[in-house]
């Protein structure tokens, strides 16, 4: 099964509550999305591999650590764009690629309409950024695109998620022996229903999120 990590950090919980408050103004909402994204970026990258390197300090030569894995950010258009800035605060060198999806009105299946991925991946880890994991359709479809592209480690990073969305993620066709290594879902809070006020505010700030579900 996929590993689900729900943040319990007091700052995340505090800011998430303000984010979902119906009285939060759009400008403040955007700021909170950026701030929460930065906080969960710290948690979502806790398992990145590092390697040793030597360098000189003002006093002596020493051995330290640097990231071994290159990271790519994949915001699902358009709602995921609001999370990119928060991640860039911690990893300014991360490359960003965009994948656009919309839901077919007849089949209710996600349809890819935008994909500007390079011919071959230049990173070892891809983080799918999407604030709200609703049915899991767009997240699963994005993961499938990245798998076909050749990425070996994929993580979903979001703000809130529904149980339905969580359950949908294991249906991705992944080698079961490597499931936990390949697909890890990071969310701030698991909710029984999608929060309407959050959806409306996402609509205000990032465009029609229903078009990418």
Give, region by region, the residue ranges found by the protein language model.
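PRPP-associated nucleotide enzymes
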Residues: 1-213
